[in-house]
């Protein structure tokens, strides 16, 4: 079930891994799916950590497994910037900022 889930859901990094010219490479994840992935990460941390959850939990989870994830370097950088912003400013302020940038048609890779 897990292989099916991550292979069909574009917010999983595994979806953005492809063989190009005979070599496996990470592909830059569209910002829409970066945001979905951040939400998925937050939800998973809240479910598994329950009362132990803090605004740092999604970042800590990401950092603990980032070497095992084959994210495109630009995607990895954006993930970490957003997760650090959550740690410092909280979810509400982070998603408010993301919504503002998206409504202004800004590229999160450039503007966040």
Regions found by a protein language model. Name each.
Residues 1-112:
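Metal-dependent phosphohydrolase cores
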């Amino acid at each position: 079930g897990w292989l099916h889930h991550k292979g069909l859901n574009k917010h999983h990094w595994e979806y953005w891994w492809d063989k190009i010219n005979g070599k496996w490479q990470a592909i830059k994840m569209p910002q829409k799916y970066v945001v979905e992935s951040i939400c998925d990460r937050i939800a998973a941390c809240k479910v598994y950590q329950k009362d132990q959850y803090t605004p740092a939990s999604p970042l800590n989870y990401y950092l603990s497994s980032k070497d095992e994830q084959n994210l495109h370097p630009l995607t990895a950088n954006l993930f970490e910037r957003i997760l650090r912003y959550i740690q410092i400013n909280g979810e509400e302020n982070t998603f408010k900022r993301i919504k503002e940038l998206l409504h202004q048609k800004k590229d999160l890779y450039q503007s966040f």
